[in-house]
Amino acid sequence: MNSLELKYGCNPNQKPARIFMADGSELPVTVLSGTPGYINFLDALNSWQLVRELREATGMPAAASFKHVSPAGAAVGTPLSEEDKKAFFVDDEGELTPIACAYIRARGADRMSSFGDWAALSDTCDERTALYLKHEVSDGIIAPGYAPEALEILRSKKHGKYNVIQIDPNYVCPAVEHKDVFGITFEQGHNFSKIDRDLLGNVVTKNKDIPEAAKIDMIVSLITLKYTQSNSVCYVKDGQAIGVGAGQQSRIHCTRLAGSKADTWWLRRHPKVLGLHFVDGIHRPDRDNAIDLYISDEHDDVLADGAWQRIFAEKPEVLGADEKRAWLAQQTGVTLGSDAFFPFGDNVERAHKSGVSCIAEPGGSIRDDNVIEVADRYGMAMCFTGLRLFHH
């Protein structure tokens, strides 16, 4: 099949709509279930590139959770701790496969933003991954293949309307790509820049020690940024994004946004949060919303009389400001990536507040000396990659 008609474009009034191969070749994607739309395919094709590159760069299964053409989260398939399982709502005792761990981590980066996400897997979707997705609110998935039992589970989701796309893993896009804006065609070379350990050799700080785990986290952050709407900053820990700041005009606002998401990720692991007792039958999105309010300054919205009884089996204690500050101060070993240089040292100051110890950014600012000075003040290791990763 060379062309696929779509219901509409970005909005219902934008018709006609389709995807097609301009060179007359066959589409490298097959719809196995549902009727994916225009934005679904944008998410699918961007997220597939991300997980494919993560797989190639790390040698580990990878997954992403996309919303509006940017990743809410991305991760490689390292095992989950018992604390991870509680935070990510892994309710059963079944063994988790690496690809299932990758998606659970990717979605767990920012569960609020991943509501109604597009899932992407670097490897065949197995039954364990499909079972986890079955209980999440999601729009669709792309993968290079599906185990029969996994496909059966996914096809039953959303009363048979869940979008399932299979992509040819051997497909390679053309070297030159085109995009029309206001009737004018833009042409550029595809971004084939390779992100691997070779990119991390120019360490510009006094601290030259970048542990192997941090190098993997740098790779995860940079590949995630490669497919995130610019400007963008990404915080990573233990092989998973824990905060993505996307599409901000100001670099410091990217760093603050991603940092606040990383803080939320860490606060969800506070003993008071992991110990919350919810009423029977409450769905995961409602739990996510309740936790988000509980750890915020608006906690009265879920703790007031008449409110908490609808959510919790017993009234939780307030998670106070001092408790949150003390807990956040324990966050360490975080890696940060930026899709372009830091123009001021304030970005490093903000990163430090969320436990960042290693940074990867292109360098090239006229204030690089100031940025390095601030990193040195906190004993961080920072490398200049020389590679900008804008994505639009």
Language-model segment annotations:
Residues 53, 227, 264-268, 353, ...:
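Conserved helix-loop functional segments at active or binding sites
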Residues 220, 228, 235-238, 245, ...:
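Nucleic-acid 5′ end/cap handling module spanning
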Residues 36, 40, 214, 247, ...:
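Alpha-helix N-cap/helix-initiation motif
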